[in-house]
């Protein structure tokens, strides 16, 4: 009797077959068996795949597909011993295995989001989809990676600066006319600039910029000449214009015959004359008998206005 039991105990491991193929290791069907008693470790713990270990121990509780496959694992008999491999119960489980892929496919169709989530790597492997957090699965590049198109746009942004203004190509006739005008005067008035632009078929801005550049070039070629010209060519003093008609050497030239018309002469602008103008300096007084305004204005009317007041 003891010999028969020893022989049966020794013959039992002969039915145990270990498969080292990748499909058998990654097959989720072999992860659903309950734990054996202390005689040997549970097949589920012994045959865990690398993807399930990385996913974590709580993947089985979050995966609805695995809960459908193992309704007896959460039942009251979960702690009981599972039948030995090679027994009739195991053969019945192997006979029912072809139905489980259909259940998994059906569950994957009903719950596509959970099947594709990284919390269910076993269901993703069973349905043939690549696992994102697995070791060999393809990993999607983040949006900020160098391969994405957004960094390319950012690289092109510094190059997309404000376009530079095109330089004006002046013709030979335009350059000659501009040079002749610059020799005549280095600063143009508004009317001169407008007339010159219309005559040369240019805009006022083009003429103004050309004169600015030409003045800058001239100042570099003749340093200090512009300041000396301004000091030497100052305007004459207004007080030097009095006296002998319009032909004086120090005054501004006047029209011919101004000496005969005494009412066109201008007095000197001194402080006393501005504050207290004298009646003799104005030709409109009644003392001048040859004045054209004498018949219209009497002496009693003009004298109080032009008499000095203290």
From Swiss-Prot:
It is found in: Nucleus; Nucleus, Nucleolus. Gene3D superfamilies: Homeodomain-like (1.10.10.60). Residues 42-66, 97-108 have a biased composition (Basic and acidic residues). Residues 163-222 bind DNA. Residues 87-96 have a biased composition (Acidic residues). GO terms for molecular function: DNA-binding transcription factor activity, RNA polymerase II-specific; RNA polymerase II cis-regulatory region sequence-specific DNA binding. Residues 109-118 have a biased composition (Low complexity). Residues 230-252 have a biased composition (Gly residues). The keyword Amino-acid biosynthesis does not apply. It comes from the Eukaryota. Its main location: nucleus. Disulfide bonds: none annotated. Residues 36-165, 217-260 are annotated as: Disordered. One of its GO terms (biological process) is cell differentiation. Residues 140-149 have a biased composition (Pro residues). GO terms for cellular component: chromatin; nucleus. Keywords: Developmental protein, DNA-binding, Homeobox, Nucleus. Interacts (via the homeodomain) with HIPK1, HIPK2, and HIPK3. Belongs to the NK-1 homeobox family. Transcriptional repressor. May play a role in early development as a Wnt/beta-catenin effector, hence controlling pluripotency and preimplantation development of embryonic stem cells. May promote adipogenesis in mesenchymal stem cells, possibly by inhibiting the expression of the antiadipogenic factor NR2F2. May inhibit osteoblastogenic differentiation. This is NK1 transcription factor-related protein 2. It comes from Homo sapiens. The lineage of its organism: Eukaryota, Metazoa, Chordata, Craniata, Vertebrata. The gene is NKX1-2.
